[in-house]
Amino acid sequence: MPPLHDIDISAVTSKSYPILAQLRTALWPQDSYEAHLKDLIDLCDNHGMTAWLAYDSNGTAIGFLELSTRPYVNGCLYRPVAFIEGIYCAPNWQQSGLGTALVKVAEDWAKAEGIREIASDTYAENWAARHAHQKWGFQETETVTYFRKNLSK
């Protein structure tokens, strides 16, 4: 892989939604490209989500980070909280420092907005993601189990 200094990280615009939708499909394959594209339009245009795409020196998209602002996040001390909704590095870019670079861009954005904490989540059994978050300087705060009950019966 090329050196990390050859990477360009750019804010997502409506013109780059199709590229981001393709990468989202790689991260979350249970949803179609079309569903991801529709979701992006809604989240970015109507709900204030911010996102960045990382490109290699050939202009190929190799990663992304999506960030929202939440009024509260479990385990955080301050409000509001910048929240990483999704982060992805193409397989050949994992453990290259690209994830760290994407998180740094999100941190800088949050600081510029006057936000004092950034948070994220992952499944408890996703050890690779948990390790990556610790490498990026995150501290685990708590593990939550969600419950549901169908009320339509």
Segments predicted by a language model, with ranges:
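A short beta-loop-alpha structural element at the N-terminal edge
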Residues: L4-L20
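Helix-loop element at the rim of GNAT/NAT acetyltransferase active sites that forms part
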Residues: A21-A35, G75
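Active-site rim helix/loop that mediates acceptor-substrate recognition in acyltransferases
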Residues: D31-D56
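Conserved beta-strand in the GNAT
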Residues: L53, T60-T69, F83, Y88
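A conserved beta-turn-beta hairpin within the catalytic core of GNAT-like acetyltransferases
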Residues: P71-I84, Q94, T141-E142
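Conserved acetyl-CoA-binding loop-helix of GNAT-fold acetyltransferases
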Residues: C89, Q95-D108, H131, K135
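Conserved active-site alpha-helix within GNAT-family acetyltransferase domains
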Residues: T100, A112, A124-T143
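Conserved GNAT acetyl-CoA-binding A-motif
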Residues: V103, A110-T122
